[in-house]
A protein has these predicted regions:
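Membrane-interface elements of multi-pass transporters and channels
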Residues: 37-41, 74-78, 146, 150
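Membrane-proximal helix-loop-helix units in multi-pass membrane proteins
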Residues: 45-104
Length: 150
């Protein structure tokens, strides 16, 4: 069963950590780039009070979930990681939604539900992870783009 502990070689663990770190760096860099570009177009400051509050609201659940996932990864509980990343990402979106678009809250709740569903059906965790982080992000982006035209 996927809930069992999986022995991961030090090389395998290093590869997983490098992939995770690379993904994190690319995500943060692209978020900063696109946010900076948008704020520059609007003649606004990138780090105003609202953006600082949003950042803190997002980072508390994200860092908590990231640290928990690292602990579970080192202990060999790999199967639970995709659902947990969905859940903590959803919690971060819900927590940060009071500082941004109202649709963010709904996306967060959907991510949490997908994560909880993935915990129940752990063998489909990676597929549900791809659905939550891939398909749902695209759908959300299309909805926001249509609702808030530039």
């Amino acid at each position: 069963l996927v809930y069992n502990v999986v022995e991961i070689s030090p090389d395998g663990l290093m590869h997983l950590l490098l992939i995770a770190l690379g993904t994190l760096i690319l995500s943060i860099a692209s978020a900063i780039f696109f946010t900076h570009r948008k704020t520059r177009q609007r003649n606004q400051s990138l780090f105003n009070q609202q953006s600082k509050e949003l950042l803190v609201s997002l980072l508390i659940p994200l860092i908590t979930g990231g640290l928990l996932c690292l602990v579970l990864l080192f202990k060999g509980f790999v199967g639970i990681l995709p659902p947990l990343t969905l859940i903590f990402y959803g919690l971060a979106l819900v927590n940060g939604s009071k500082h941004t678009l109202p649709e963010i809250r709904n996306l967060g709740l959907i991510e949490i539900c997908i994560g909880l569903f993935a915990v129940q059906f752990i063998e489909y965790g990676l597929v549900l992870w791809a659905f939550g982080f891939g398909v749902m992000q695209i759908v959300y982006g299309l909805i926001v783009q249509k609702k808030y035209p530039q």
